[in-house]
Amino acid sequence: MNAPIVRPLAELRSMVRGWKSRGETIGVVPTMGALHEGHLSLVRAARASCDRVIVTLFVNPRQFNNTEDYAKYPRTEHTDAALLAPLGVDALFVPDGDEVYPPDHATVISVSGVTAPLEGAHRPGHFDGVATVVTLLFNMTGADRAFFGEKDWQQLQLVRRLVQDLKLPVEIVPCPCVRAEDGLALSSRNQRLTAEGRTRAAALPRTLFEAARRIEAGAPTAEALAAAQEGLEAAGIGPVEYLELRDGETLGEPQLGRPARLLVAAWLDGVRLIDNVAVTLR
């Protein structure tokens, strides 16, 4: 039996009120659908630690700054429901766009600082769309805990900052990035790669991990990043939008003694791929 699909907000809120009245905890996994093993790992984590699990499926138009990317984003609701069936999801919330954003919707939530570099510099307005929809979904679902993958590292830091600054009563639970056998981070957009492109894409994580290893071994950061850039270009991956070492929390300049993160965004077959890896600075 597929996961029960709930569309009207009033119906979801009625379910949530019943659960809350019994003191049950609610775990939420926000998604845009086109589910893969990465999403399912978040659902399993929610199932293991919460009494009730809601998966949200909403392709948020406000976080796309490219209309073609929005139009091409995979929409596979029935397949998604079937994938969730064995995982014990209590509700697959698929709201109508007009219920999330009525015609007179006028509120935008913007988080500064952590959103400025990397994705923020290349996708204007993207993080405003993310912050706004995440806040809406937390309110709609009554989330006690929300589960986010570390693949979208900058998004994870945004959500943490959002919850902290707005004093939202939601615990943010980070979950490890899930990778294919060749190391490529799982993403709904990967299915748009050609067979040849999918093979070449394995060079992205391989190059990223090698650059991280070199930096941890003491190589100058600029030298390691230049070699990684050359490696990506040699593999036919590009253009590279960014390949940067950043502080793991603030995404400012990395500091000795603090966790750092190496992040990349690059194009292949007309598909934008992102990835990141932890780096220990000594």
Curated annotation (Swiss-Prot):
Annotated pathway: Cofactor biosynthesis; (R)-pantothenate biosynthesis; (R)-pantothenate from (R)-pantoate and beta-alanine: step 1/1
GO BP term (any one): pantothenate biosynthetic process
Record family assignment: Belongs to the pantothenate synthetase family.
Single GO MF descriptor: pantoate-beta-alanine ligase activity
EC number(s) recorded for this UniProt protein: 6.3.2.1
Entry's localization field: Cytoplasm
Gene: panC
Gene3D superfamilies: HUPs, Pantoate-beta-alanine ligase, C-terminal domain
PANTHER family in alphabetical order: CYTIDYLATE KINASE/PANTOATE-BETA-ALANINE LIGASE, PANTOATE--BETA-ALANINE LIGASE
Species in which this protein is naturally found: Paracoccus denitrificans (strain Pd 1222)
Name of the protein in its database record: Pantothenate synthetase
InterPro entries: Cyt_trans-like (IPR004821), Pantoate_ligase (IPR003721), Pantoate_ligase_C (IPR042176), Rossmann-like_a/b/a_fold (IPR014729)
